[in-house]
From Swiss-Prot:
Start and end residues of each stretch annotated as CPSase: 1-160
Free-text function comment from the UniProt entry: Small subunit of the glutamine-dependent carbamoyl phosphate synthetase (CPSase). CPSase catalyzes the formation of carbamoyl phosphate from the ammonia moiety of glutamine, carbonate, and phosphate donated by ATP, constituting the first step of 2 biosynthetic pathways, one leading to arginine and/or urea and the other to pyrimidine nucleotides. The small subunit (glutamine amidotransferase) binds and cleaves glutamine to supply the large subunit with the substrate ammonia.
Name recorded for this polypeptide: Carbamoyl phosphate synthase small chain
Organism expressing this protein natively: Caldanaerobacter subterraneus subsp. tengcongensis (strain DSM 15242 / JCM 11007 / NBRC 100824 / MB4)
Keyword Ligase part of the UniProt annotation: yes
UniProt family annotation: Belongs to the CarA family.
Catalyses which reaction(s): hydrogencarbonate + L-glutamine + 2 ATP + H2O = carbamoyl phosphate + L-glutamate + 2 ADP + phosphate + 2 H(+)
Binding site for L-glutamine: S45, G211, G213, L239, Q242, N280, G282, Y283
Subunit and partners: Composed of two chains; the small (or glutamine) chain promotes the hydrolysis of glutamine to ammonia, which is used by the large (or ammonia) chain to synthesize carbamoyl phosphate. Tetramer of heterodimers (alpha,beta)4.
Positions annotated as active site in the UniProt record: C238, H323, E325
Matching InterPro entries: Anth_synth/Amidotransfase (IPR050472), CarbamoylP_synth_ssu (IPR006274), CarbamoylP_synth_ssu_N (IPR002474), CarbP_synth_ssu_N_sf (IPR036480), Class_I_gatase-like (IPR029062), CPSase_GATase1 (IPR035686), GATASE (IPR017926)
PROSITE patterns according to UniProt: GATASE_TYPE_1
Pathway participation: Amino-acid biosynthesis; L-arginine biosynthesis; carbamoyl phosphate from bicarbonate: step 1/1; Pyrimidine metabolism; UMP biosynthesis via de novo pathway; (S)-dihydroorotate from bicarbonate: step 1/3
EC identifiers of the protein: 6.3.5.5
Length: 356
């Protein structure tokens, strides 16, 4: 049946509603990956958003059991130029549409995604609605996205190495797998875990995950991070990067249209190397707010010059805006997990010998 994407500025894009669910509200964003739609729709960082795929043909390899980044999709809607209803892949177990229908996600096909993406680039991300009735009003909900995507109770992923307190702000499975693969004994905590909660395991290091929304809303995680800076090694990715920056006294700002996709170029200012990275964020650390006497900018985005990584000059604290674990995307910078392990082991040995 005929369907529409209506934006908050009144713009309407017409297409075909191909899903069982005919209505969905959310912030309309675009992602530029040619592949990786399964990872994108199950990435908790997309919670509360209607995702527009810029690549024109989506669904051609179906859905498999290996590429999920969480237990369910977190998007509010899915928009494509053309949907492939006959997937072909040896791992495919069901079609993309079948999967989204099973989770009540509205899907709009036949949209001029090129024109839509251009509009979002020029005017910024907007709230919108997928609907069968263009007269419908756009709703604005106040859902606590962190509560929606974070684990409800602590759990452990056993490893042979140092104990890592992992603050789940809406993590992707790929991050947990990478940290566990380098040896961390991971204890996962909810987004609102307290200092006392975390200290029950006496961790060797702290990790802050990716996640959705405005980093300034993550008040509990910011306060927790302040406690551990200078006390334990700390690493953050994506939202975790922004939270570390806020805990260090920096500011974050909402971007015009964000970075979403598996092809974002980043320069490592310490090594002068360039990487192609996977990203998914709508906020950035404001460079002007960084105290350069204490904090070094380690990475920048080559498209717009925004901050992609920071490191404290005197403390074992660093973070990156991009996703080094990829899922989907290039694995140019997976060595960050080994680097973190090295820092934690050095820090741990130093305190061991100090106690002896």
């Amino acid at each position: 049946m005929k369907g529409y994407l209506k934006l908050e500025d009144g713009s309407i894009f017409e297409g075909e509603l191909i899903s069982k669910n005919k209505k969905g509200y959310g912030e309309v964003v675009f992602t530029t990956g040619m592949t990786g739609y399964q990872e994108a729709i199950t990435d908790p960082s997309y919670a509360g958003q209607i995702v527009v795929m810029t690549y024109p043909l989506i669904g051609n390899y179906g859905i498999n059991k290996y590429d999920f980044q969480s237990e369910k999709p977190h998007i509010r809607g899915f928009v494509v130029r053309e949907y492939c209803d006959k997937p072909s892949n040896f791992q495919s177990e069901e079609s993309l549409l079948s999967y989204l229908d099973n989770h009540n996600i509205p899907v709009l096909s036949g949209i001029d995604t090129r024109a839509l993406t251009k509009k979002l680039r020029e005017n910024g991300t907007m709230r919108g609605i997928i609907t069968y009735n263009p007269e419908d009003n756009i709703e604005f909900d106040q859902t606590n996205l962190l509560e929606e995507v974070s684990t409800k109770k602590p759990y452990r992923i056993a490893g042979i190495g140092p104990k890592l307190a992992f603050i789940d702000l809406g993590t992707k499975k790929g991050i947990l797998k990478m940290l566990n693969s380098v040896g961390f004994d991971i204890y996962v905590f909810p987004y609102n875990a307290s200092y006392d909660d975390v200290m029950q395991i006496n961790p060797d290091a702290i990790f802050l995950s990716n996640g959705p929304g405005d980093p300034k809303d993550a008040v509990d995680a910011i306060e927790l991070t302040k406690h551990f800076i200078g006390m334990k090694p700390v690493l953050g990715i994506c939202l975790g990067h922004q939270i570390i920056a806020l805990a260090l006294g920096c500011n974050t700002v909402k971007m015009k249209f964000g970075h979403r996709g598996a092809n974002q170029p980043v320069k490592d200012l310490l090594t002068n190397k360039d990487y192609i990275t996977s990203q998914n964020h709508g906020y950035a650390v404001e460079e002007e707010s960084i105290d350069k006497d204490k904090i070094t900018v380690t990475h920048i985005n080559l498209n717009d010059g925004t901050v992609e990584g920071i490191m404290h000059k005197f403390l074992p604290v660093f973070s990156v805006q991009y996703h080094p674990e990829a899922c989907p995307g290039p694995r140019d910078s997976t060595d960050i997990f080994d680097k973190f392990m090295d820092i934690v082991m050095v820090y741990k040995r130093r305190f061991y010998f100090a106690e002896v």
